[in-house]
From Swiss-Prot:
GO terms for molecular function: metal ion binding; peptidyl-prolyl cis-trans isomerase activity. Residues 1-95 form the PPIase FKBP-type domain. Folding helper with both chaperone and peptidyl-prolyl cis-trans isomerase (PPIase) activities. Chaperone activity prevents aggregation of unfolded or partially folded proteins and promotes their correct folding. PPIases catalyze the cis-trans isomerization of Xaa-Pro bonds of peptides, which accelerates slow steps of protein folding and thus shortens the lifetime of intermediates. Both strategies lower the concentration of intermediates and increase the productivity and yield of the folding reaction. Also involved in hydrogenase metallocenter assembly, probably by participating in the nickel insertion step. This function in hydrogenase biosynthesis requires chaperone activity and the presence of the metal-binding domain, but not PPIase activity. GO terms for biological process: protein refolding. It comes from Treponema pallidum (strain Nichols). Keywords: Chaperone, Cytoplasm, Isomerase, Metal-binding, Nickel, Rotamase. This is FKBP-type peptidyl-prolyl cis-trans isomerase SlyD. The keyword Magnesium does not apply. Coiled coil: none annotated.
C-alpha cells in the first residue's frame, strides 16, 4: 500500500543537522504516527513520504523552506523583565508563551542583560537544513474514527483542515 492522502502512516526516523548531530529520533519518543495530507508533520517530509510503501527505508534532506522556514529577524525582540512572572528567575534557553488570549506564540530566551531580556519567536530549527533517515513501518487507510479524532484535534488546536489545502473530506483516492 502506497502512502497517499488520508492514510495513517507510522514511521521511525532519525533527524540530524548539517554537522551530523542527532537532533531528534523515534528511538527516544517512539515511532511517529500521523495522517498524510493534514499538515501534521513538516511539509518537506510529508512530500517525501508520498508514494512510499511499508518497509521502505530512505534518506531525505529538507531545506528550511520545507521545514520550519528561514529565521525571521522580526521575531527576535527585546522585552523588559516586568513582562515575565516576578518570582521566576529568567535564564537563557527558557521557553515562554508570549502574547495574550488565544494569540500566543512560544518564545525562547536567548540573552539576559539585567532588566532587559532578549527573546526569539522563531522555531528552534528555523533556518536549518534537516537530514532525515526514515523507515516506513506501516501504512493503512484512515478510518472514520481516525479522521474524526483528527478533526477534533484540529478544532481544539487552532489548526485548519489540511492546513488550508482543501476540504476535510476524503479525497476519494484512498491509499494505493
Amino acid at each position: 500500500m502506497k502512502i497517499a492522502n488520508e492514510c495513517v502512516v507510522n514511521i521511525e526516523y532519525t533527524l540530524r543537522d548539517d554537522t551530523g548531530e542527532i537532533i531528534d529520533s523515534s528511538d527516544v519518543m517512539g515511532a511517529l504516527e500521523y495522517v498524510q495530507g493534514h499538515g501534521m508533520i513538516i511539509p518537506g517530509l510529508e512530500t517525501a513520504l508520498i508514494n512510499r510503501e511499508e518497509g521502505e527505508e530512505f534518506s531525505v534532506t529538507i531545506p528550511p523552506v520545507g521545514a520550519y522556514g528561514e529565521v525571521q529577524e522580526d521575531l527576535r525582540m527585546t522585552v523588559g523583565r516586568d513582562q515575565f512572572p516576578p518570582n521566576v528567575p529568567i535564564e537563557v534557553g527558557m521557553r515562554f508563551d508570549a502574547g495574550s488570549g488565544g494569540d500566543s506564540r512560544p518564545v525562547t530566551v536567548t540573552d539576559v542583560q539585567g532588566e532587559t531580556i532578549i527573546v526569539d519567536g522563531n522555531h528552534p530549527l528555523a533556518g536549518k537544513t534537516l537530514h532525515f533517515e526514515v523507515a516506513v513501518r506501516s501504512v493503512r487507510e484512515a478510518t472514520d474514527d481516525d479522521l474524526a479524532a483528527l478533526l477534533f484535534r484540529e478544532s481544539t488546536s487552532g489548526g485548519g483542515c489540511g492546513s488550508g489545502a482543501g476540504g476535510c473530506g476524503s479525497c476519494g483516492a484512498g491509499c494505493h
